Amino acid sequence: MPPKKPEPKKEAAKPAAAPAPAASAAPEPLKDSAFDPKSVKIDFSADQIEEFKEAFSLFDRTPTGEMKITYGQCGDVLRALGQNPTNAEVLRVLGKPKPEEMSSKTLDFEMFLPILQHISRNKEQGTYEDFVEGLRVFDKESNGTVMGAELRHVLATLGEKMSEAEVEQLLSGQEDANGCINYEAFVKHIMSG
């Protein structure tokens, strides 16, 4: 009988607790699931906006220079402006378009600016410990190193894939004579520059 008494208390507590998390959790899914460009306050200076507009215009492929880019170009423009969003972040702020819409749907500069502001404010950067922990998975001998060839393969084929040139630039000068990379020193190097 003692186990039965806590169960009704838990059930009684759950309905009381459920409304509180539901109320506090409601805004979070809206934030993650739908990006509302109208809710973004633009904090850029006039000079910055002019610079962004100039970069945006370089990606405009419309025949009459309508200042529009395809959804597929949005991530490229953001990266050209110094941001580093993941493809998933770009898709989320675009409203999760279908693959075929990436080349057919367009957005103008006025629609792009709130996206840029949102991405620039919400940079999710990992910590030193996060990166070291992630690389430790590949440390088969538990000696603080990973094989350069394996890291090259992972960077070029998994997640946000990097080009071979990007991988080579990133790993340049990091391998020892055995082709191993001290990943703690590597992470410090990456995070310092």
From Swiss-Prot:
The modification N,N-dimethylproline is found at P2. Keywords: Methylation, Motor protein, Muscle protein, Myosin, Repeat. Expressed in atrial muscle and in fetal skeletal and ventricular muscle. One of its GO terms (molecular function) is calcium ion binding. Myosin is a hexamer of 2 heavy chains and 4 light chains. Residues 1-37 are annotated as: Disordered. Regulatory light chain of myosin. Does not bind calcium. InterPro entries: CALM/Myosin/TropC-like, EF-hand-dom_pair, EF_hand_dom. CDD domains: EFh. Residues 47-84, 126-161 form the EF-hand domain. This is Myosin light chain 4. It comes from Mus musculus (Mouse).
